[in-house]
A protein has these predicted regions:
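N-terminal helix-turn-helix DNA-binding core of bacterial DNA-binding proteins
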Residues: 30-72, 83, 99
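Short, locally clustered residues in the helix-turn-helix/winged-helix DNA-binding domain
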Residues: 49-53, 114, 142
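Alpha-helical linker/hinge and terminal dimerization helices associated
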Residues: 27, 31-34, 66, 109, ...
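N-terminal leader segment of winged-helix/HTH proteins
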Residues: 1-42, 126, 146
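Exposed, interaction-prone assembly regions rather than primary DNA-binding/catalytic cores
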Residues: 135-150
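Charged, amphipathic alpha-helical coiled-coil/dimerization segments
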Residues: 78-136
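Pre-recognition alpha-helix immediately N-terminal to the DNA-recognition helix
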Residues: 26, 46-52, 108, 135
Length: 150
């Protein structure tokens, strides 16, 4: 679907969905590579980011939030803990659980990665889009965000 066509028919919406999927995949690939040289798997980056956003979480809560198996999340978190990026603390009311949170180094690394991604994206927006296109993008952001709200 070209930028000049308007959505309306099921075929137009399907074409738009396909183009958006491709563009989103390419954008994510670029953002993942813009980590300022930080060596981290995508699952490690997501877990670190979720802990930075949502604060201390149990393995089960983190796995549920990211829609992965607890065993997979345990493996990811073990690597982050070995690297000194997350810390463990007992749950205040349930002694069977452990809460994980960012260490100071994890917070520093997460901030560094976010800045690198935002710098790349800001540069791409200002160098590749006209002012009118930038306005259109800004207008579309809430619409895109609403597509992924739970």
């Amino acid at each position: 679907m070209s930028a000049t066509r308007k959505a309306g028919s099921a075929a137009d919406v399907a074409a738009a969905a396909s183009e958006l999927r491709v563009a989103a995949s390419r954008l994510l690939r670029h953002l993942r590579s813009a980590r300022a040289g930080i060596e981290m798997t995508p699952s490690q980056a997501v877990a670190l980011s979720r802990l930075g956003t949502d604060g201390p979480l149990s393995v089960a809560d983190l796995a549920r939030a990211e829609r992965v198996r607890p065993q997979s999340m345990r493996t990811t978190l073990a690597t982050l803990e070995e690297r000194g990026l997350v810390t463990r603390a007992p749950h205040p009311t349930d002694q069977r659980q452990v809460l994980l949170s960012l260490s100071d180094e994890g917070r520093r690394l997460l901030t560094l990665a976010h800045h690198a991604k935002e710098d790349w994206l800001a540069t791409a927006i200002t160098t590749k889009l006209s002012p009118a296109e930038q306005d259109s993008l800004i207008t579309a952001i809430p619409l895109l965000a609403s597509l992924v709200e739970d």
